[in-house]
Amino acid sequence: MNTLKAGATYVGEGTTEHGIRYVEVAVPAVGKGEDVKVKIIPTKAAGDVLNSCTKGANLLIGGRLYRNRAVQGDFNSYLIPTKRIELLSSRIPLNEVTIAGAYWLNDNDIKANQTSKERHNFTILTSAPQQPLLNHEYDDTISFSVTSWKYDAERILQTAHTGRQMIIEGYLRSYTPAGSDTGYVSVTVRSGLVEMFGKKKEKEGSKISKPADVSKVVIQGESKEELPI
């Protein structure tokens, strides 16, 4: 599971390096931070609103989040709509993400966790339906950088282990380091909205050497409405 529901502002249209049309929107920041840029791949499910929008239009969007595997070094977030995009009369502060998958720590997580005792950074590896335009296959995984705080961070530290299945609800956050043209998008866990499944600890000698358990995540197949136009 890798879904986003959010209010957003229409920014404009463009094409990827391999010629795929997208519509860029800005999702409002929660608290401090920048608006989050998301690129929408138009689908039948989205309806025809995106064809008549002007810059600054307020939208309600919903769908699955992906990365673009077709272009190396493309770190943008892409949304495949699963429901009709609505035109709103005013901006709404909605930014909700649900991610389910396998717990994982990469080198950046480990480094970040050394600087704070109240924060725990980790990665969730999840699966998603095939999206040929983004070169995403059923066997591919999508990684989401996640930040948890205080009680949630402590609980995850005590009960999570590599490969353990979990589900979180949170919001997208964007951060661009000083002097950099590239921003980083992560998910921040909302207080108390994290659940883990399966055994709390691995059995002795059963350590996971690679994130193979992602395949255990249940995937809902895409409908005809989710297919790109």
PLM regions and their residue ranges:
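Beta-rich strand-turn-strand
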Residues: 44-69, 146-180
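Extended, hydrophobic interaction surfaces within ordered domains
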Residues: 24-86
